A protein has these predicted regions:
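Multi-bladed beta-propeller domains
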Residues: 5-39, 69-92, 118-141, 152-157
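Short catalytic/ligand-binding loop motif for oxyanion handling, primarily in non-cytosolic enzymes
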Residues: 22-23, 61-63, 113
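A short loop-to-beta-strand structural motif that recurs across blades of beta-propeller domains
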Residues: 2, 65-67, 113-115, 164-166
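Beta-strand C-termini and the immediately following turn/loop, strongest in propeller blades
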Residues: 45-48, 53-60, 69-70, 94-110, ...
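Extended amphipathic secondary-structure runs
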Residues: 2-14, 48-57
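Residues that flank catalytic or metal-binding motifs in active/ligand-binding sites
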Residues: 62, 75, 161
Length: 166
C-alpha cells in the first residue's frame, strides 16, 4: 500500500503485511441514492481526511482483519480480527459517529449478524442475533440510531431464501 502526498509529490509505503499471500482492499463509502443510475461514480474511501479503513484477509479467508490507517503513520492498525477454521465472507463496514463507532457484519456464531464496536476494536454490543441471516446494511440513521438492513430466514413459515427489509 502506498499513500501519495500530492502537494509535495512524495509517496510513502505503508506496512500492511500480516499473512502470506494476503489480500488488501479499501473500504468505500456507499454511493448516494442520487448516484445509483450514473454510469461512473468515483469511489470515496470510508473515513475522513485523517483516517480510512481497509480489510486484510488471508488467501484461504480463514483470517480477516478490519484495519484503520491514520494519515502520517507507518503502518495500518488491526481493529477487529476474525479467525475461523472455515472460509468467511465479508460485508462492507458501516461507520458511525464520525468514525467513533463501527457496525461490523460477521459469521462468528455460524449465522450472519451485526456487531457494534468502538473505534479501538472493543465490542460494545451485539446488534442482531438468532438462527437467521443478515445479508447487508442498507442505511443507518445516526440521529435515531436505526439500522435498515436486508435479512432472510427470520420469518417463520416463509421460504428462508426470501429477503426482507428490517
Amino acid at each position: 500500500l502506498y499513500v501519495f502526498d500530492m502537494q509535495n509529490n512524495v509517496r510513502k509505503e505503508i506496512k500492511v503485511a500480516a499473512f502470506k499471500n494476503q489480500n488488501l482492499s479499501l473500504s468505500y463509502k456507499p454511493a448516494e441514492q442520487k448516484q445509483r443510475d450514473m454510469e461512473y461514480v468515483s469511489p470515496v474511501w470510508l473515513g475522513d481526511n485523517d483516517r480510512f479503513f481497509l480489510v486484510r484477509s488471508s488467501r484461504d479467508l480463514h483470517r480477516i482483519d478490519i484495519c484503520s490507517y491514520t494519515i502520517g503513520q507507518d503502518s495500518i492498525v488491526p481493529i477487529i480480527q476474525e479467525r475461523m477454521n472455515t472460509y468467511q465472507e465479508t460485508r462492507p463496514l458501516a461507520v458511525l459517529n464520525k468514525g467513533k463507532e463501527l457496525i461490523h457484519w460477521s459469521e462468528r456464531d455460524g449465522w450472519a449478524h451485526l456487531y457494534l464496536y468502538d473505534d479501538q476494536g472493543n465490542l460494545k454490543n451485539r446488534i442482531t442475533k438468532g438462527p437467521w441471516h443478515v445479508e447487508q446494511v442498507l442505511k443507518v440513521d445516526e440521529a435515531t440510531r436505526t439500522i435498515y438492513f436486508v435479512g432472510n430466514g427470520k420469518e417463520e413459515g416463509e421460504n428462508p431464501y426470501y429477503e426482507q427489509l428490517y
